[in-house]
């Protein structure tokens, strides 16, 4: 069974109202100003704040978004999490009871738009049949954190179950003569 966590871009209407976003995550913090939204206001700002390109061209590709995917197969489970903005030293994976907790944080640093600091916490429930003691974690060169664990498959041998026959009826009711 595959459970894909969709990015909010995929759950939006085709042409959303970007002036007044309905959810906090629909607000594009840290992005450039789009002069098409407020024409009278745009003349007061420096062109360095303007956003270039059409709105559809600004949609991030899959590789640029912080997606997470949970895959649950019959013999194993895997969590894939995009953490490319963090170094291995800034990541922490813990198992607390039946939950896997992933934390990442880095201090303020400069990027192409200015200064940014990032932090996130994610919790995943350990699937049934997975021993938390054998869960492993690895970080790929392109910044994908993979958490895996084998599922216990019960090796119950097949056997035939004999059928016995009772002389009494299963449902008590009026006696037929």
UniProtKB/Swiss-Prot annotation:
Known PROSITE patterns for this protein? SHSP
* A cellular component annotation (GO) from this entry: cytoplasm
> Which one Pfam family would you cite for this protein?
Crystallin
**Compositionally biased intervals (Basic and acidic residues):** 155-169
Q: Matching CDD domains, A to Z?
A: ACD_HspB4-5-6
Task: Indicate which residues the UniProt annotation says bind Zn(2+) 2.
Answer: 106, 108
InterPro entries in the record, alphabetically?
A: A-crystallin/Hsp20_dom, Alpha-crystallin/HSP_16, Alpha-crystallin/sHSP_animal, Alpha-crystallin_N, HSP20-like_chaperone
Q: Which GO terms describe its molecular function?
A: metal ion binding; protein homodimerization activity; structural constituent of eye lens; unfolded protein binding
For the ligand (Zn(2+) 1), the binding residues are 85, 113, 121
Arranged from A to Z, the UniProt key words for this protein are: Acetylation, Eye lens protein, Metal-binding, Zinc
Query: Which GO terms are recorded in the biological process aspect for this UniProt protein?
Result: negative regulation of apoptotic process; protein refolding; response to heat
Point out residues bearing the modification N-acetylmethionine. 1
> Could you tell me which residue ranges the sHSP domain spans?
58-166
Give the family, as the similarity comment puts it.
Belongs to the small heat shock protein (HSP20) family.
Self-association or partners: how does it assemble?
Heteromer composed of three CRYAA and one CRYAB subunits. Aggregates with homologous proteins, including the small heat shock protein HSPB1, to form large heteromeric complexes. Inter-subunit bridging via zinc ions enhances stability, which is crucial as there is no protein turn over in the lens. Interacts with HSPBAP1 and TTN/titin.
Question: Function of this protein?
Answer: May contribute to the transparency and refractive index of the lens.
Q: What protein name applies here?
A: Alpha-crystallin B chain
Classification of source organism: Eukaryota, Metazoa, Chordata, Craniata, Vertebrata
